[in-house]
Amino acid sequence: MAPRKTKPATKPAAKPTPASTATTSSCPSPKSFPIPMEVDDFSFSDSELSDAQSLIEPEGFSLLSPDESSGGRSQDELPPARKKRRVAGPKERRTQHLDLTPRLGFSDYGDQEPQLNLLVNTIRNHKKIVVIAGAGISTSAGIPDFRSDDGLFKTLQKKHNLKASGKLMFDAAVYQDEALTASFQEMVRSLSEEAEKSSPTAFHHMLARLGSDNRLTRLYTQNIDGIETSMPPLATQIPLNVKAPWPRTIQLHGSLEKMVCQKCRHMSTFDRVMFDRPDAPECPECVLTNQFRMETGQRSHGIGKMRPRIVLYNEHNPDEEAITSVMNADIRSRPDALIVVGTSLKIPGVRRLVKSLCSVIRSRRNGVTMWINNEPPSGKEFEDCFDLLVKGDCEEVARLAQLKRWDDDSKPIFDECQSADVERVKNEQGPLSVVITTPKKEKVQAQTGMLTPSSSYDGDVENASTTTLSNPASKGRKLTEILKASKKDAPKTESAGVKKPAPRKRTKKEPVKNAKITTFSKVTKAQKVTPEEKSVKLEEHKAMHPLPPGAARTNAPMLPGLAKDDSKSTPSGKRGQLETISPDRIPKGMGKLLD
C-alpha cells in the first residue's frame, strides 16, 4: 500500500490590515464559490509566487513599493512637476522701406514714423550689433568710393587712359607691368594723402559710440583709408590672431596704414616718400640682410619690394584664416542686429557673411537686419534678408539716432531748483491759469421703495411679526380708500351709441415654400402664390377601404371555378360589414369529398 502524501505545512494567514481589506474587498471570498473549497487551496509555494511575479514584472523592470518609490514621503511632500518651457512661435517678417532722400529741402519724415522708430530704437537699444561697412561711409569725409559714377574705377580709367575699367588698378597684375606699377604707385600715394587729411564723419562717431558702450560686437570694414581705426573704440590689430581675443574692427581688405615686403614679409608703417617713384621701393630689411651676407661671403638671396598691405584682386588674403575664425565666432554668438551700410556687396566672401548673419539674426524674435545705401541690394538671394531698407545717406541716419560722440563722457545733469528760483521763473513767465471744466453729472433718481435690510437678526424678526409697517406711498390711508378714490377719478367713457372700431385681427402669414439656393451663401425667395392658383382645388379621392380578414389580396379570384366571372354589383350595404359569399353550384368532385 502506497504511503499517503501529506500536504506541506503552511503558515497561518496574517490578519489583514485596514488598507489591505480595503483593496481586497472587491475580490470574491471562498464562500461565494458554488463548490466547497478549503483554505489550503489558496496557499501557494514560493516557486509559484516567483513565477507569478515574473509575469507581472517585465524584464529590466521591478515593482517598487510606495515607500521605495516616493522615499517614504507623501504626495504633498514631493517636489512639484517640472513645467514645460513655452516656446514662442516665429515672428512674422516683412520688409519695410524708409526713404531718407532730401525732399525739396525738408527733412520731415512724419509719414514714415513706424520705420523711423524701428531704425532709431535698433541703434539706441540693441546690445549686440554687427556692422558691415563699405566705402559709402567715407564719401562725406572726401574719400571717393569705387563703383559709383564719380568713383575710383571711373576716374582712374580716364586719368591713366586705361582700356579696361579702373578695377585693373586694384589687380595683382599691376606689378607685372611697369606702366601699371607707376600708375598704382601714384594712386596709392594720393589715397594716403586724402585719408590723412580727412576726419571721421558723424556716422564714424556713431559707430565709435556703440563701441565705447560695448554694444558693437564687430565692425567688418572693406575700406582701406583707416578712418575707423583712428578712433580708440574702433582700434584694430595687424596682423590678426587666428584665435581669440580679436579686436572690435576687422579690416577685410587691409589698410594703407601699413606696408609689407613681398619677400620677407617685413611689415612697417606706410611711408609715402618711398612710393614717390615709378617702381616699387626696396625693402630696408632685405637690404640689410643682403649686405650682411655679401660681407660674410655668402650668396645673395635677393631684395624684396615693398607694397601697401592691402588685398588686391586675384591674390591671397594673409588674414584669411583669422577672418574666418572671427566670422564663425560672431555667427555662433547670435547677434541681435545687423547693419549693412555703404556697400554694394560685390565681393563673394562678404555676400556669404551677410546671408549667414541675416539667417541667424532673423531667427531671434527681437532680431533686426537693416540695409542703408542709395541703391537696394542686388540679387534674388537678398530679397527676403532685411527687415528695413533705408534709402539715403548714412549721415542722415546718424543725425536721427542722436547719439553722443564717443569721447563725450558727460552724464545728463538735472539742475536742482530752490523755491526762490521757482518764484523767479513764475514772475518771468507770468501767471499761469489752467481752466478745468467740471463734467456734467447725471441726475440720480431717488429711490421711493423700501430698501433691503443689510442684516437680519432673530430679535428683528420677532419685532417684525408683532409690529406692522405702514406703506409710505399710502400716506396713512387704507387700501380700500385708495381703490375708491381711483374709481371716482377715472376718466368718463364715451357715449354708448358710438362704437369703437374693432381691432384688426392679425392674419397669419402664409408659409413660404422652401427657398431655392442658386449660389453659395445666396438664397432666392420663393414666388408668391397668385389668387388664381389658390382657386384651383385638388381632386378629391375616395378613401381606400381595408380588406376584411381572410379576403383575397389580389383582384383575380383564387380559384376560377369557385365563383362566376360576372360583373354583378354587390348589394349596397354599409361599409365595414362582412358579406357571405356562397357558390351557386358545387364543383365537380367536391360532392364525393363531402360524402
UniProtKB/Swiss-Prot annotation:
One Pfam family here: SIR2
> Which positions make up the signal peptide?
none
Q: What residue stretches are annotated with the Deacetylase sirtuin-type domain?
A: 109-428
Q: Which GO terms describe its biological process?
A: negative regulation of transcription by RNA polymerase II; pericentric heterochromatin formation; rDNA heterochromatin formation; replication-born double-strand break repair via sister chromatid exchange
| One GO cellular component term | nucleus
GO MF terms, alphabetically ordered:
histone deacetylase activity, NAD-dependent; metal ion binding; NAD+ binding
Active-site positions on this chain: H253
| Official protein name in the record | NAD-dependent protein deacetylase hst4
